[in-house]
Amino acid sequence: MKLLLLALPMLVLLPQVIPAYSGEKKCWNRSGHCRKQCKDGEAVKDTCKNLRACCIPSNEDHRRVPATSPTPLSDSTPGIIDDILTVRFTTDYFEVSSKKDMVEESEAGRGTETSLPNVHHSS
């Protein structure tokens, strides 16, 4: 019976000592707690479910998205791939032709050189 009388006050005080045990939800990018009233040194930033206030410590600068440093895509030291990508071509234009195309062109050119048939007139 004495053990029960000791355990009962411990179970009543435990939620007040450990905030996570009392079931307070995290809010404002997990930097605040949903409470009925904010404690000293906390500021209300938003409202939670069940008409509770999202309380965050007022002495810190809190943002919705934590500041992160940009991640470089690759290191800036030049390598073999950089050399390959910066090669400039000297040939701007070239034409590919086949033997068949050359034969067709030569036949088309000769078409105007054909002679007219001889026409004989009788008197």
Swiss-Prot record:
Post-translational modification: The three-dimensional structure formed by the three intramolecular disulfide bridges is indispensable for antimicrobial activity.
Compositionally biased region (Polar residues): 112-123
Cysteines paired by S-S bonds: C27-C54, C34-C48, C38-C55
Keywords: Antibiotic, Antimicrobial, Cleavage on pair of basic residues, Defensin, Disulfide bond, Secreted, Signal
A single BP term in Gene Ontology: spermatogenesis
Subcellular location: Secreted
Compositionally biased residues, Basic and acidic residues: 100-110
Tissue: High-level and epididymis-specific expression. Most abundant in the epithelium of the caput and present in the epididymis lumen and bound to sperm. Also expressed in pancreas.
Ranges where the record places region Disordered: 100-123
Signal peptide segment: 1-19
InterPro entries according to UniProt: Beta-defensin (IPR050544), Beta_defensin_dom (IPR025933)
Job of this protein: Host defense peptide that exhibits antimicrobial activity against both Gram-negative bacteria, such as E.coli and S.typhimurium, and Gram-positive bacteria, such as S.aureus and B.subtilis. Inhibits cell adhesion of E.coli on intestinal epithelial enterocytes. Causes rapid permeabilization of both the outer and inner membrane of E.coli, leading to morphological alterations on the bacterial surface. Binds to bacterial lipopolysaccharides (LPS) with high affinity, and may thereby be involved in immunoregulation through LPS neutralization.
Protein name as annotated: Defensin beta 118
Record lineage: Eukaryota, Metazoa, Chordata, Craniata, Vertebrata
